[in-house]
Amino acid sequence: MISSIYIFKILLSYLGVEYEINQLSEINQEFTNKLESYNQFIKHTQKDEDYLLGQSAVISRYISNNHNFSGKSLQESARVDDIVESVLEIIEEYVLPIINSNIINEEITKLLCTHFNDFENQLSKSTFSAGDSTTLADLYLFILYDITLRYLENHGHLAHHFNEKYPHLERLKLHFLSNKSVSEFINSNNINSQSSQLII
């Protein structure tokens, strides 16, 4: 199952950050009113001068910035942001509808391959997608590649579009899966067994 905190858990696991996830069983009016009082992206609170973040991409960047995982320069950071946004668009436009409907065809597969070819070409020019070290951009590429391949395990007639065609993306996958915490989390979440609830 891919949950709304799937990306965060992989990110925090990779960075070795301990975390506690609190989920609500229901959303009451009091909680709704509180959310409405916050800015869509970020809100400075007077009480403890903490920041409240509102969207998953923003939260991922916030975590990454605090762990030097967003690039070493403004140029690299901009590149990271660009890749993260691209991956989220692909997940929202193609991957989630495929998983939720359990329908995939040649046309959708070819569109995904076009994006994968672009990322593969970028990685063929440099070990990492943004700069000379692993960043949030690489993690997002890995997540996109991994969830796509794992879903296609149940659709063998389309898997040939991806098998052994993206060695650089495969290298990223092996890198992140070599992290024990990341590997354990992913192996315990089978996207083929339940519908996706990924919210981006």
Curated annotation (Swiss-Prot):
Ranges of residues in domain GST C-terminal: 73-195
Entry's transmembrane regions: none
Alphabetical list of InterPro entries matching this protein: Glutathione-S-Trfase_C-like (IPR010987), Glutathione-S-Trfase_C_sf (IPR036282), Glutathione_S-Trfase_N (IPR004045), GST_C (IPR004046), GST_superfamily (IPR050213)
Domain GST N-terminal as annotated: residue spans: 1-71
GO molecular function per UniProt: glutathione transferase activity
Pfam families, A to Z: GST_C_3
Family named by the database record: Belongs to the GST superfamily.
Record protein name field: Glutathione S-transferase domain-containing protein DDB_G0273153/DDB_G0273923
Organism field: Dictyostelium discoideum
Lineage: Eukaryota, Amoebozoa, Evosea, Eumycetozoa, Dictyostelia
